[in-house]
Amino acid sequence: MKKLNELGDGSCGTIVAITVDSHFQSRITSIGLTIGSRIEVIQNPKKQPVLLYNRDTMVALNKNEAEKIMVEVRQ
């Protein structure tokens, strides 16, 4: 299990935990990021937002948000 912000470009996995406050929980739920969601990291540059693909949608999360999402990486 890894934090979303630790995954490299092209990594795929399933969200297994989200440790955030209720405001952020509401925001990410509204864009489809929930426990059990399958994601693919499109880009994860060092000082820019993480760009990922989830449920036919591209989503950008800043590093602080991404580090609060735990992902089970698929090989």
PLM ranges: what are they?
Residues 5, 25, 46-53:
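Short, Lys/Arg- and Gly-enriched loop/turn segments at beta-strand edges
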Residues 18-21, 55:
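A structural micro-motif recognizing beta-strand termini
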Residues 23-27, 37:
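Short alpha-helix capping/helix-loop boundary micro-motifs
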Residues 31-32:
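A short glycine-leucine-enriched loop at secondary-structure breakpoints
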Residues 48-75:
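C-terminal structural segments of small proteins and small subunits
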